[in-house]
């Protein structure tokens, strides 16, 4: 241990001691964990201690501290990690135990709202280790470290083991592990290094009775941690050494701490996680996290106002059959369709939730739930306001959002053929509408224009096909605001009257929320009025300028984002939202901006799919808690074909998870939005995630941002010099990464001889990254001979199995050299057309280029006209044959546009088009800005 100078003891556990130490070689502080001296002679505990270090070293996740080095030479047994400043969760909980009065700061830190994101991060880490086949077996507040900068990490992997490892049985045999009867169970808060693996207080009942550990034993420990977060106390605290009679009932969190205002559903989650019977617990950590999602997303508390029966006429003001086409022509599939029509007698306010269930047969015929304003409904104008139309066909459920009789949004998803009923939940809260079917989010819509009192309207053919309708209202929604009067004018489109009252309220309440809210709504009023009159929308910006520096400052940027959105200035819209989030991250109005981001994501999925990727990235970075598990699956499916077209996703076979650094990098690559790359680079560097670092350098090179590339390269050189571990894989991979980066730098500078020297010294996978980047540069710069030689060298040194990865580049070279014979042989042998080519694949485009080289223009047009997706990249490439306008590319995301320009240029070269034609695409490619903002 000569390299390390121990500074002070940080903590002591069942097997080890953790010290703050100074690393003399790297001149930095580290955390050094060594086996306790009184246990160092025990070979089994030494083995378990080293196993702990190796398991932690194999796991790469933000919630796990990476391992720098492991030493087991001679008597010294220790390993080192980054030192994270902070405190344990136990320390935080202990600071409030049995205290009746808390400081404001401590009350905020230990609130249920503050604890939930921390608990979700803990669960995310446990979900990750379970996916890797690892059980922690000693989860407790003492082993949760809360960093000063928001880090939440799980430490102490001494009890961790692989789920199906033989060591489970060996532990029983070697430690004399015996079956503990219920009467012999005692409790303590320290890990027992001998008979029992884990901390008894946090062990599941079956573990204390001798059963093997499982995912459900970790879930039990998570449940206890959640219970403590909710109640600030332990569910069955006993004096040390006292037995726990399981017959005693455990109080629910609500009963244990009624003053904490714990939502009943959250209390139920904790109780389910700590059920004595493992069968009654959550089946997985993923299921536990899914149950937490509504609470993480900040859903309101609702109370039941009324339950309406569709069979009781007393609930309804109108109750009669109607011809659907008369009132809702957009919905009727046949002009002769008659439906039962019901309009509620009761009026609901602006915050309402409607819940019911409908049969599959009813949905096949179509079911409508509408919210017409009372004034229009009383006049028989039932189509006014918002409504939802539910329909299904061919095992696909569709939900349409209707406004004033016009469909403005439609979402569809597949359904299980055997499903007989659907549970519907519609929430209208102020200016936001969310629609769930079987807890799956279908619609999220925000309208900044206020709505007045509304009624409930039901349209259905068979009354037997719908359950009773539960009407819930948000607690506190009945409070009347001084803004209600101008809101009413705005809802009636009386813009001048609304503006006059908003100004009056703004001036009457200086410094208060009513003032800045009135100014924001004044801006929305003027923006709507200008838009309706066909004026210059940018005039509305000055109204939002008045919010600058006020107590409602973030709303300045939200308002400007609305102006830019309606004006079609997407980049400026994003810039405005980012300014608000960067300048006021803790402002009370920031959740409002996060809601707006979510709305824009779902809205762009429906209207501007290229914009959706940017909003996905922003939400992942800023508000990942807003995306539920089901939405993650939906978005992954949406991104699937782009994933197949992304080199680093094909090389690195690790599954692309939605909430991951790899997904953030993936979206940065496709959008050209590189703002978050420095943080991703730092994260990958700190975790020693070499694959991520490789991918990041590839993305930076593809973006063309030489300044960022140079900065990352300098940081990498320093980082690799600091890492000096004898016989370590880190050294080898670090050296390979440095050579790879030097090769990319040489390619950027057109120093091809040096590039070849560096790239030839790295593994084939890294060569493939360089080859892909070089191919774009070589064909655009018309330096194909150099690229061809580079390609041939890599091909000659690669294995037969790896040859398939360079076929696309070989075909490109053959086409460029007009070698029809070789191009045809390579295409027909490796990508035969009769096997069905995927239209977004590279091979599909190359076949089109081959046909172009034969001179058969009509065959080329026929080839690209086969594309099923008329606005997909391959279909758009075919447009360059007859059209020199680049307007049709505007709907593409950044990388799609860049790639389409390259392939269009290549196709026109193969088609022997005049130089001035293909030069248009070449220059457009070269002139593309190297980042999202330019």
From Swiss-Prot:
Mod. after translation: Autophosphorylated on serine and threonine residues.
Annotated ranges, domain Protein kinase: 4-296
Any Pfam family matching the protein: Pkinase
GO MF: ATP binding; protein serine kinase activity; protein serine/threonine kinase activity
Annotated positions binding ATP: 10-18, 33
Leading EC class: transferase
Coiled-coil spans in chain: none
EC number, as in UniProt: 2.7.11.1
Key words, A-Z: ATP-binding, Kinase, Nucleotide-binding, Phosphoprotein, Serine/threonine-protein kinase, Transferase
SUPFAM superfamilies listed in its UniProt record: Protein kinase-like (PK-like) (SSF56112)
Reaction(s) this enzyme catalyzes, per UniProt: L-seryl-[protein] + ATP = O-phospho-L-seryl-[protein] + ADP + H(+); L-threonyl-[protein] + ATP = O-phospho-L-threonyl-[protein] + ADP + H(+)
Top-level taxon of origin: Bacteria
Active site: 138 (proton acceptor)
Gene3D superfamilies: Phosphorylase Kinase, domain 1, Tetratricopeptide repeat domain, Transferase(Phosphotransferase) domain 1
HAMAP family named among the record's database cross-references: PknD_kinase
PANTHER family linked: MITOGEN-ACTIVATED PROTEIN KINASE KINASE KINASE 20-RELATED, SERINE_THREONINE-PROTEIN KINASE YBDM-RELATED
Family from the record: Belongs to the protein kinase superfamily. Ser/Thr protein kinase family.
Role noted for this protein: Together with the serine/threonine kinase Pkn1, may play a role in the specific interactions with host proteins during intracellular growth.
Protein name in the entry: Serine/threonine-protein kinase PknD
Source species of the chain: Chlamydia muridarum (strain MoPn / Nigg)
């Amino acid at each position: 241990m000569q390299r390390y100078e121990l500074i002070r003891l940080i903590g002591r556990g069942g097997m080890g001691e953790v010290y703050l130490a100074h690393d003399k070689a790297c001149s930095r502080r580290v955390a050094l964990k060594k086996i306790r001296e009184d246990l160092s002679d025990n070979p089994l505990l030494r083995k378990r201690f080293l196993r702990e270090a190796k398991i932690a070293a194999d796991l790469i996740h933000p919630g796990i501290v990476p391992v720098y080095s492991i030493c087991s030479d001679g008597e010294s047994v220790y390993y080192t990690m980054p030192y994270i400043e902070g405190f344990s969760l136990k320390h935080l909980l202990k600071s409030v135990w049995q205290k009746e009065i808390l400081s404001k700061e401590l009350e905020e830190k230990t609130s249920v709202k503050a604890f939930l994101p921390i608990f979700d991060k803990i669960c995310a880490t446990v979900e990750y280790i379970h996916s890797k086949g690892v059980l922690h077996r000693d989860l407790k507040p003492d082993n949760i470290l809360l960093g000063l900068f928001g880090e939440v990490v799980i430490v102490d992997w001494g009890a961790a083991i692989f789920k199906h490892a033989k060591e489970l049985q060996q532990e029983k045999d070697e430690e004399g592990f015996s079956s503990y009867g219920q009467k012999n169970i005692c409790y303590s808060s320290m890990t027992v290094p001998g008979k029992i693996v884990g901390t008894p207080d946090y062990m599941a009942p079956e573990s204390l009775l001798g059963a093997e550990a499982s995912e459900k034993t970790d879930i039990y420990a998570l449940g206890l941690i959640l219970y403590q977060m909710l109640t600030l106390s332990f569910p069955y605290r006993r004096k040390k050494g006292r037995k726990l009679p399981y017959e005693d009932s455990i109080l629910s969190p609500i009963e244990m701490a009624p003053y904490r205002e714990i939502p009943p559903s959250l209390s139920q989650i904790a109780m389910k996680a700590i059920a004595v019977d493992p069968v009654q617990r959550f089946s997985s950590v993923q299921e536990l996290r899914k149950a937490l999602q509504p609470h993480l997303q900040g859903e309101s508390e609702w109370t039941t106002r009324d339950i309406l029966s569709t069979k009781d006429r007393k609930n309804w003001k109108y109750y009669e059959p109607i011809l659907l086409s008369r009132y809702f022509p957009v919905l009727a599939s046949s002009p002769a369709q008659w439906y039962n029509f019901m309009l509620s007698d009761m009026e609901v306010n602006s915050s309402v939730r409607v819940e019911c269930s409908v049969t599959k047969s009813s949905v096949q015929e179509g079911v409508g739930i509408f919210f017409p304003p009372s004034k229009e409904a009383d006049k028989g104008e039932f189509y006014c306001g918002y409504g939802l139309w539910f329909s299904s066909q061919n095992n696909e459920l569709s939900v349409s959002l209707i406004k004033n009789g016009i469909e403005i949004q439609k979402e569809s998803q597949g359904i299980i053929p055997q499903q007989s009923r659907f549970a519907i939940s519609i929430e209208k809260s102020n200016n936001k509408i969310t629609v769930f079917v079987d807890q799956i989010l279908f619609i999220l819509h925000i309208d900044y224009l206020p709505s007045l009192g509304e009624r409930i309207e039901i349209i259905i053919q068979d009354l037997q096909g719908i359950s009773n309708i539960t009407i819930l209202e948000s607690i506190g929604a009945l409070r009347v605001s001084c803004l209600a009067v101008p809101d009413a004018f705005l809802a009636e489109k009386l813009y001048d009257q609304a503006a006059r009252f908003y100004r009056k309220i703004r001036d009457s309440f200086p410094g208060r929320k009513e003032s800045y809210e009135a100014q924001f709504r004044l801006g929305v009023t003027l923006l709507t009025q200008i838009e309706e009159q066909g004026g210059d929308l940018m005039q509305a910006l000055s109204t939002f300028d008045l919010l600058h520096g006020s107590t409602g400052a973030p709303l300045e940027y939200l308002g400007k984002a609305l102006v830019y959105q309606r004006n079609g200035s997407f980049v400026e819209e994003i810039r405005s939202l980012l300014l608000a989030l960067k300048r006021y991250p803790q402002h009370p109005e920031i959740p409002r901006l996060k809601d707006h981001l979510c709305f824009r994501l779902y809205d762009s999925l429906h209207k501007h799919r290229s914009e959706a990727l940017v909003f996905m990235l922003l939400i992942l970075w800023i508000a990942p808690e807003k995306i539920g598990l089901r939405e993650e699956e939906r978005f992954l499916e949406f991104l699937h074909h782009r994933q197949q077209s992304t080199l680093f996703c094909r090389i690195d076979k690790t599954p692309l998870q939605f909430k991951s650094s790899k997904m953030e990098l993936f979206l940065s690559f496709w959008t050209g939005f590189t703002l978050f790359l420095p943080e991703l680079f730092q994260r990958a560097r700190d975790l020693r995630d070499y694959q991520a670092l490789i991918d990041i350098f590839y993305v930076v090179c593809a973006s063309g941002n030489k300044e960022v590339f140079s900065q990352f390269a300098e940081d990498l050189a320093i980082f690799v010099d600091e890492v000096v571990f004898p016989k370590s894989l880190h050294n080898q991979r670090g050296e390979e990464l440095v050579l790879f980066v030097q090769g990319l730098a040489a390619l950027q500078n057109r120093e091809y001889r040096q590039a070849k020297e560096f790239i030839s010294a790295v593994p084939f996978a890294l060569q493939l990254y360089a080859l892909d980047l070089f191919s774009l540069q070589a064909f655009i710069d018309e330096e194909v001979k150099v690229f061809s030689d580079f390609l041939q060298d890599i091909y000659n040194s690669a294995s037969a199995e790896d040859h398939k990865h360079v076929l696309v580049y070989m075909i490109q070279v053959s086409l460029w050299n007009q070698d029809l014979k070789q191009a045809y042989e390579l295409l027909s042998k490796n990508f035969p057309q009769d096997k069905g080519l995927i239209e977004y694949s590279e091979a599909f485009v190359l076949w089109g280029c081959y046909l172009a080289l034969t001179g058969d223009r009509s065959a080329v047009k026929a080839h690209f006209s086969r594309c099923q997706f008329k606005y997909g990249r391959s279909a758009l490439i075919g447009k360059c044959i007859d059209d020199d306008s680049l307007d049709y590319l505007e709907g593409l995301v950044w990388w799609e546009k860049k790639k389409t320009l390259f392939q269009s240029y290549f196709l026109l070269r193969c088609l022997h088009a005049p130089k001035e034609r293909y030069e248009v695409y070449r220059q457009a490619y070269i002139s593309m800005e190297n980042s999202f903002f330019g």
